[in-house]
Amino acid sequence: MSPSAGLQFSLYFLQTKKVLWKLTDKEKGLCYILLFTLCFFADQENGGKALASPPGIWKRADVTFDSNTAFSSLVVSANKKTVKNVGVPQVVPDNPERFNSSPCVLGSPGFRSGKHYFEVKYGTQREWAVGIAGKSVKRKGNLMLVPEERIWQMGLWWLRHLETDPGRVHSTSGKITVFVDYNGGNVIFDLNRINTTLKANFNGEEVVPFFYLGGTVSLTTL
């Protein structure tokens, strides 16, 4: 069984432990076997990954990076589908749209209604975050990656939380999918086939894809 199904089994166990403790040892054993089997088959039916897609119909967004907003050490590819932190400030104009203190970049298109999603490929590097931000997000000065700053994000920090050692660097590449339910006020992240939902109050403001790249990180939109 793949690690994702094993993790899913653990999560189901934690969610049902309040019921399981009331059962006899024999009944508990049967429940454990049933949960394990269900997770295994869910894993196999989705090509070795536990199912974790949010319900509903979502419109795929073809996201590109906006080089006019990119921090000086972030280099956007010619096709605007990849961005890399080269670690050295480049000579770029300090226009009002550009982040000047935090290694961030925004993307397009923006969203004002409906249900949308976009996918981003990440590598083995550390310190990155992907999400959305209000179009009015602060560009100058230090930036906190929190909803109070109009930013809803998920990234390597969450992956570290899943590890036994909180300081251990995640060593595999993968994909993160961001679902934006504008009217419902939800931002849903599918990372490692586990969904995490953040409640959001957009206040009618347009929101755009948001990316943070610390260290020598590169991200590619799919």
Curated annotation (Swiss-Prot):
SUPFAM superfamilies assigned to the protein according to its UniProt record, in alphabetical order: Concanavalin A-like lectins/glucanases
Organism of derivation: Crotalus adamanteus
Protein name listed in UniProt: Vespryn
Residue span(s) of the pro-peptide: 45-52, 160-222
Main location per the UniProt record: secreted
Presence of the UniProt keyword Secreted in the record: yes
Record family assignment: Belongs to the ohanin/vespryn family.
Cystine pairings recorded for this chain: none
